[in-house]
């Protein structure tokens, strides 16, 4: 499958910024990069894809987010839609820039059936 373009990679960052600005996750504000890790782990888990993890140094389990530079276009659409779903569920007011990216992802998916 075709690898995502730089433009597609840039599409997700305004959405991640909206999450970072508006969502407090278990009492903590997260960075855009931390949200990217959480969202990509979610996407992999919901698609039953292999999710890289390792035992934590002090116990527990650490899941590694996906580096999207080698991701497919379809995967990037899945990430954008997951951000939108999660944000909407948490009452995030998406910016105009984010709304345009969400519309692009929905149009892309609709054109692929």
Predicted regions and their residues:
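Acidic (Asp/Glu-rich) sequence patches and key acidic residues
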Residues: 1-113
């Amino acid at each position: 499958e075709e690898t995502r373009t730089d433009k597609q990679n840039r599409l997700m960052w305004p959405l991640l910024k909206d999450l970072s600005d508006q969502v407090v996750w278990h009492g903590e504000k997260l960075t855009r990069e931390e949200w990217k890790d959480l969202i990509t782990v979610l996407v992999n888990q919901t698609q039953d894809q292999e999710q890289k993890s390792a035992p934590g140094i002090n116990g527990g389990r650490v899941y590694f987010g996906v580096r999207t530079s080698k991701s497919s276009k379809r995967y990037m659409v899945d990430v954008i839609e997951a951000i939108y779903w999660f944000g909407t569920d948490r009452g995030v007011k998406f910016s105009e820039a984010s709304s345009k990216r969400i519309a692009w992802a929905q149009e892309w998916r609709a054109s692929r059936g």
